[in-house]
């Protein structure tokens, strides 16, 4: 305006209109990273189970960690994803059309083999937990069946016992029966 006054509309200003300090927001991503880090690698009298930290295993790691440690296994997870890990397993990727998170899993299982775990556990899971919020609880086909692709394309998996059973966590009774087998 000619008199030097300013008019700001639509809250499009770079600076907030209020002079108050913003309150700290809860960062769910940081919380999840801290939670996963709290599950320390451990040893067990029945050997070690390596878990690749990709796709659905982030969400399910606390469950599987508890499951295997209660059964007497030590649990070890693969390192955090990065470009170096991707290149470690790149030579075993059969198709360039799969998503990048799936491609990373090749490096994760290679890292677990190199770490010397006794077993690598990566189940095929067509269904996930039923949270009662949707009509179905299907996993993406890549998430559900990628363990089969790894078994067929990562030669180093023959150096360890690779466990890729079919589990569905959506029906607890069936899970208990499958886990006994």
Segments predicted by a language model, with ranges:
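An N-terminal assembly and electron-transfer interface module characteristic of large anaerobic redox
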Residues: 1-181
């Amino acid at each position: 305006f000619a008199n030097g006054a300013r008019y700001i509309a639509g809250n499009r200003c770079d600076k907030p209109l209020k002079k108050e300090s913003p309150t700290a927001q809860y960062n769910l991503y940081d919380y999840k990273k801290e939670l996963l880090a709290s599950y320390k690698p451990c040893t067990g009298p029945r050997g070690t189970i390596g878990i690749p930290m990709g796709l659905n295993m982030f969400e399910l790691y606390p469950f599987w960690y508890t499951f295997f440690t209660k059964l007497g296994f030590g649990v070890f997870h693969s390192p955090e994803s990065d470009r170096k890990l991707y290149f470690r397993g790149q030579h075993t990727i059969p198709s360039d059309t799969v998503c990048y998170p799936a491609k990373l899993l090749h490096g994760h299982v290679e890292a677990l083999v190199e770490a010397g775990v006794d077993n690598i556990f990566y189940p095929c899971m067509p269904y996930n937990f039923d949270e009662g919020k949707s009509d179905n609880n299907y996993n993406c086909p890549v998430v559900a069946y990628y363990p089969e692709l790894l078994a067929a394309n990562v030669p180093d998996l023959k150096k360890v016992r690779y466990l890729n059973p079919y589990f569905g966590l959506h029906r607890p009774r069936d899970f208990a029966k499958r886990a006994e087998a």
